[in-house]
Amino acid sequence: ILMQGRAAGKKFVGCHSLEELVANLSAPRKVMMLVKAGPAVDTIIDSLLELLDAGDIIIDGGNTHFTDTERRTKYVEEKGLLYIGTGVSGGEEGALKGPSMMPGGSELAWPLVEPIFKAISAKVGPNDDIPCCEWVGPRGAGHYVKMVHNGIEYGDMQLICEAYHMLKEAGGLDNDQL
């Protein structure tokens, strides 16, 4: 329901299988996964490797640990393909309006996806024309930056919770005052 009506007037091609997806892409093909980190990523990579050709790009936009991205980058490159581990931040609003993106991995892949990533990323600046996306480095760098980002974000949330608790308990303020 969240996406209902949002594709009106846009060019989308629905696919029912990885085979159909790959067949609908132009070379060099770029396939972005947004799945839960862990074994599912390896399963999808192995399935894609059977369908893609040398020079095609696999992109992991999940919250993967950077050491897994380093391993996967090496594995995919050994098969002749390129791999990008991309930190993606912004939640539901980012999904709809553009996320902050932190790509890293196979450096040869960046020029091939840069225009796409910068087009779909959030924009900042006085004219909202500066993309929230820049290449952050090789191997697991993108997911490393996302890990640091999450650490800062969770630290900020904890600080807000503790300040709220102190103001409520020690300061005697109620929820409406806070």
Listing of model-derived features with the role each one plays in the protein:
Residues L18, N175-L178:
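Alpha-helix initiation and N-capping motif
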Residues I1-E20:
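NAD(P)-binding Rossmann-fold cofactor-contacting core
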Residues Q4, N24-A27, S47, A119, ...:
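Residues within well-ordered alpha-helical secondary structure of globular protein domains
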Residues I1-L2, M32, E93:
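Tryptophan-centric aromatic hotspots in well-structured domains and transmembrane helices
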Residues V41-I44, D60, H65-D176:
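Rossmann-fold dinucleotide-binding core
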Residues G14-I84:
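Rossmann-fold NAD(P) dinucleotide-binding segment
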Residues G5-A7, L52, D56, S121-N127:
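Alpha-helix termini
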Residues M3-A7, R29, G98-M101:
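Short low-complexity, flexible loop/linker segments enriched in glycine and/or proline
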